[in-house]
Amino acid sequence: MRNVDEKFNEWKTRATDAEILAGLKSLEADENARINAFYKDLEFGTAGLRGELGAGTNCLNVYTIRKVTQGIANCMKKHGWARASVSCDSRINSDLFARTVAEVFAANGVKTFITKELMPTPFLSYITRETKSDIGVMITASHNPAKYNGYKVYGSDGCQLADAGALEMIGYINEIDPFDVTTGTLEEYVKSGEVEYIGDDIIAAYLDEVLKRRNALAEGLTVTYTPLNGTGYKLVPAMLKRMNVAGLDIVKEQSMPDGHFTTCQIGRASCRERVFRAV
């Protein structure tokens, strides 16, 4: 097994991404941070992949995203799978990582459907089924602090992978050199039809399905809602209006996506503050 310095030097030699090169430069003077970034590879499992943003094999970045996606693409080829759906949340670099996933899939002949903007995770599950995709990928780290991001994989049923599926993919992922992944630009793949944006008609159909499943009437209710700087900032208000709420008050300072979660720091101590902001 190669040691930290060997892997660090390889990245300095082979990486071309400007953000990663800057990150590697900062690691030169910080031994502890360098060790943390390179002492292992990020581990893929049933929950997908999650890690701190930054340069290194133990961090989430464009190279580790490419590695995982190429491994999944190779696994898909074995099964004859050729369709994938991709979306992302409001976290730092989520949109970049979603683009990266789509670019690698398309380079491998996988027809890829991608949302034009960030969406809630359940929407990814929906479009995976709606587009008859074999695999769905959601770039998100759920409830974790802002310095994290993640990569969640879903099956054709819109559910997270079971243990057996994740284990099979791990074998393919471990074979990939992150600096030797064929890719291109999202724009060229959209032009060629290998990548397709999810349209407003599918978003409307999703809201229709949600509306069918409501178990209580909302007419007459006045609702205060905070997206907490996350992905619900468009679909939730749209859904509430469809439910004919009497009034809707959205917390202004938390109404727009913010990957730094500036107004709602993660942690139990801040839960009370979030409620006070809303009411």
Language model features by range: what are they?
Residues 85-148, 239-272:
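N-terminal small/polar loop signature for handling phosphorylated ligands or for N-terminal nucleophile
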Residues 16-19, 23, 128-134, 144-157:
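N-terminal glycine-rich phosphate/adenylate-binding segment common to multiple enzyme folds
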Residues 273-279:
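Positively charged, low-complexity/disordered segments
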Residues 2, 6-101, 108, 187-190, ...:
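An N-terminal, well-structured beta->alpha segment
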Residues 49-51, 56-58, 91, 119-120, ...:
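Short, glycine-/Ser/Thr-/acidic-enriched flexible segments
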Residues 15, 33-38, 42, 149-272:
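Gly/Ser/Thr-enriched, mixed-charge loops and adjacent short helices
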